[in-house]
Amino acid sequence: EMKYIASWSGGKDSTASIILAHEHHEPLDLIIFSEVMFDKGISGELPEHIDFIQNKAIPIFESWGYKTKILRSDKTYMDCFYHVVQKSEKNKGKRQGFPRPNMCKINDRCKTEVLERFHKGLKTGEYQKYIGIAKDEPARLSRIKTSDDSQISLLQKYGYTNQKSAE
């Protein structure tokens, strides 16, 4: 049986996608959010953002009958900060330290990796993933069309631009 999963960042586009699924009676079995942790006990998300996620949006989604799941990586911001570089000859043995512009590994190691692991646990062809990409983002839309047939943008399907998502 096909499962329908919304990949939710808590931003305007992915939130609008869930609202559209609800308003248009699209099937939705699970909403997943990947929380970056500062350390094992403290969220790395902005306090206002994680408050919105946990205390405003999730209760509404659950009142609509949707199951939500917060995923967390085993790796935290602090793990990345104190990571000892192994591969680079120039920096081998040094600590990673503060994320560098355009070279930040935090999102990759603490957010994306746990989402990819979650999806790998599902069988191809058994799930459809809703993602929040607006119709006026052609470059991003073209990447999903070429990379993964299991992804669909409800914003594109219903003609939502970035501006309309914000409303």
Describe the residue ranges of each PLM region:
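Nucleotide-activated chemistry modules centered on ATP-dependent adenylation/adenylyltransferase
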Residues: 1-167
